[in-house]
């Protein structure tokens, strides 16, 4: 379908071009003549385009359309290509393409058609003058040169005058068409605005009053049918959405009320629990401190028990040393007894010897009396030595018995000390175990205190969050209530107005069980109940 339309447009353009060529008298012979002189015309065209570029740069009115010299060079290249195709005089698709490219480029640059006419005038002037120059017979006479110069000036003046007149006429016509087009656009705009006001005024007034049952008439002009249908559909969807939002807002209001109660209760409970946990945390800290103090004292007791164990062990060692010393004393007493026995035997033998000496002295008579006295003294000394030996033996025997009793007592003491040492070791081990358990309990209580402190902080944060949630639910409740009131300000009842027969200016009588709101719409008891809520 598009290809057919494009083909028809192309044929129409070709027919229009042929008609223009026919009207201008450009038949095949004229086109062939142009092609024959194409090589001679090309240098003249290039000179003319250079002159055109200089004039465009020198003219302030023309130069303001160009941002840089590169745009002028670009225009020069396009015009050179255009004149190259034009002097080929075939007027085919390539020519149409070149014409369109040049026209689009000049349009983008903001050049009016007057500049196109002026550029053609300059090129045509150079071409005509060049043709006259080439065709004029060479003459050495000054009269011929003067006539040639006069003819050139005349032709140039005629070309300039004709194209200036054409440019002015085209500019005036173009301005007139543009003004006419602007007037037509203004009139069309006023007509459209008037039609839009007629079509939308009552509709917009009803919407401003909050009546969402208002609809645009279905017999609107075809131009506005898509807008009318779209607006009516959109309003229907908005009405349905607001009705659903009204129901959901009512349900949300009830839910938020429940949430407010739950949040308030949770906030109170969380605060009370946080205070209770803080109190328990203080008590637990006191208990932990007491257990830590007890643990320190248990450690001191453990050290004291260790010192006691060492002292008892030393006492056992001393008792052992005492037993060893008493054993040595007993051995010495035994030896002393033996020595005393020897002394007693010596005293007995000495007594016998003294007795025998006395007997012998008595037998000797007077000569042995001195010896008898000595013997008597020796006997007395022997008796005293024997008595002393017996006394010492009795003392040594008593001492030996006492030493044996002391050894037995010291042995029992050593056994008791050993038992005490074992008990002290057991007590020390028990105290060490108690100290370790106390230290573990202190660490466990410290961990429990830290965890309970974390729980207390969490409860405090929960209480704060609950308070914030309560405040948020209060705000949300207020927002939902305001949303419900805002929704209920709109007129959403379809029975009050008919979408098909919308008459914005017609006054609607409210039933007896309905009330007219300050917005001018009919408000049902259900809406009033929502407002009361």
Curated annotation (Swiss-Prot):
Domain Methyl-accepting transducer: 248-477
Region span, Disordered: 501-533
Keywords: Chemotaxis, Transducer
Gene3D superfamilies tied to this protein: Globins (1.10.490.10), Methyl-accepting chemotaxis protein (1.10.287.950)
One Gene Ontology MF term: transmembrane signaling receptor activity
Family: Belongs to the methyl-accepting chemotaxis (MCP) protein family.
Name this polypeptide is given: Probable chemoreceptor McpE
């Amino acid at each position: 379908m598009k290809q057919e339309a494009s083909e028809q447009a192309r044929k129409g353009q070709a027919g229009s071009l042929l008609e223009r060529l026919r009207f201008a008298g450009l038949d095949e012979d004229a086109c062939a003549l142009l092609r024959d002189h194409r090589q001679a015309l090309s240098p003249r065209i290039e000179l003319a385009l250079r002159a055109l570029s200089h004039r465009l740069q020198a003219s302030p009115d023309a130069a303001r359309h160009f941002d840089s010299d590169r745009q002028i060079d670009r225009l020069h290249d396009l015009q050179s290509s255009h004149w190259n195709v034009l002097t080929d005089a075939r007027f085919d698709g390539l020519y149409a393409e070149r014409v369109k490219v040049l026209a689009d480029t000049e349009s983008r640059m903001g050049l009016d058609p007057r500049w196109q006419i002026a550029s053609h005038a300059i090129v045509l002037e150079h071409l005509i003058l060049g043709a006259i120059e080439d065709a004029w017979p060479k003459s050495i006479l000054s009269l011929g040169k003067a006539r040639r110069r006069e003819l050139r000036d005349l032709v140039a003046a005629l070309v300039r005058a004709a194209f200036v007149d054409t440019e002015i006429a085209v500019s005036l016509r173009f301005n007139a068409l543009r003004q006419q087009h602007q007037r037509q656009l203004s009139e069309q705009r006023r007509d459209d605005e008037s039609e839009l006001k007629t079509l939308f005024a009552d509709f917009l007034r009803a919407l401003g009053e909050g009546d969402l049952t208002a609809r645009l008439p279905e017999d609107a002009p075809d131009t506005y049918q898509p807008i009318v249908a779209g607006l009516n559909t959109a309003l229907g969807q908005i009405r349905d959405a607001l009705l659903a939002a009204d129901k959901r807002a009512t349900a949300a209001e009830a839910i938020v009320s429940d949430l407010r109660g739950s949040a308030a209760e949770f906030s109170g409970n969380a605060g009370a629990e946080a205070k209770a946990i803080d109190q328990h945390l203080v008590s637990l800290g006191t208990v932990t401190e007491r257990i830590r103090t007890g643990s320190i004292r248990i450690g001191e007791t453990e050290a004291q028990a260790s010192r006691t164990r060492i002292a008892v062990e030393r006492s056992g060692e001393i008792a052992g040393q005492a037993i060893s010393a008493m054993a040595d004393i007993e051995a010495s007493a035994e030896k002393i007894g033996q020595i005393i026995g020897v002394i007693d035997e010596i005293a007995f033998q000495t007594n016998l010897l003294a007795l025998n000496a006395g007997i012998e002295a008595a037998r000797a008579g007077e000569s042995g009396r001195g010896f008898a006295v000595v013997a008597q003294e020796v006997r007395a000394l022997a008796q005293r030595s024997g008595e002393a030996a017996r006394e010492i033996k009795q003392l040594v025997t008593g001492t030996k018995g006492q030493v044996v009793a002391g050894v037995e007592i010291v042995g029992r003491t050593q056994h008791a000390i050993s038992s005490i040492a074992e008990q002290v070791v057991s007590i020390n081990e028990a105290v060490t175990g108690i100290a370790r358990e106390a230290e573990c309990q202190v660490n466990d209580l410290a961990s429990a205190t830290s965890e309970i402190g974390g729980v207390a902080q969490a409860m405090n944060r929960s209480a704060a969050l609950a308070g914030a949630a309560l405040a948020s639910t209060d705000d949300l409740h207020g927002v939902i209530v305001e949303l419900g009131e805002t929704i209920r300000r709109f007129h959403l009842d379809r029975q009050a107005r008919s979408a098909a027969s919308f008459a914005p200016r017609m006054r609607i009588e409210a039933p007896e069980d309905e009330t007219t709101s300050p917005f001018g719409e009919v408000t049902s008891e259900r809406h009033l109940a929502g407002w009361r809520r």
